[in-house]
Amino acid sequence: MEPKAKKNNTLKKIIKSAKHLFLENGFNGTSIRDIAKKANVQSSLIYHYFSNKVELWKTVKESLINPENFSSINDCIKQDTFESFVEKLVEARFNIHASNPEMLKILDWQRLEKNSSLSGIKNQQNLTSLDQLEEKVRFFQETGQLPKKLSAKYIILFISAATIAPFTLSYELDKNTLEKNDFIKTTTDLLLKAFKE
């Protein structure tokens, strides 16, 4: 095996081992030594690829991202109306959560860790940021589609909470309880009603 391919395989093995342990034990419950042991490499080799455990955590989260699902978030900021923006964002977030239970689990761990440095991913520039979504909400406020008295940050937070809630409750236990089109329509209608009144 040539050196570049071996290096790539080692990196993949480290990320795969870290993912398994982070999903099982969270950030604080997993040490670099644990990851090295599972990956069958020296701890120092992990530090060759990653400057610290936080960088490895963010890389693991990035490895869980399905670019196709996340690109639909980018489509949200292209919408001309607040109604279509909310509908696209609800649908995009539904698809992301429904197709990625491992990401939900790692985000649950992240919330429990109470460590703000764990937020985001290593290559954040590839995805639409919360700042961009908030900027789009402010555009809708400036164009009269949404009351200016509402905080753009809290609007995005409210949409995020509404779209993740079913997945943090019982969705994983009974996937038949949530019908995609009904969820998108009902959630969109309720959010629009809440923001317009």
Predicted regions mapped to residue ranges:
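Short helix-capping/turn signature of helix-turn-helix
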Residues: 50, 109-114
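Hydrophobic/aromatic-rich alpha-helical bundle segments in the mid-to-C-terminal region
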Residues: 104, 119-120, 127, 138-189
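Helix-turn-helix
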Residues: 13, 17, 21-55, 59-60
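Amphipathic alpha-helical packing segments from all-alpha helical-bundle domains
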Residues: 68-76, 95, 99, 116-143, ...
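Short coil/turn segments at alpha/beta junctions that flank glycine-rich nucleotide-binding fingerprints
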Residues: 24-28, 100, 143
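N-terminal intrinsically disordered/low-complexity leader segments
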Residues: 1-9
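Amphipathic alpha-helical linker/stalk segments
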Residues: 58-88
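Helical hydrophobic small-molecule/effector-binding pocket
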Residues: 86-109, 160-164
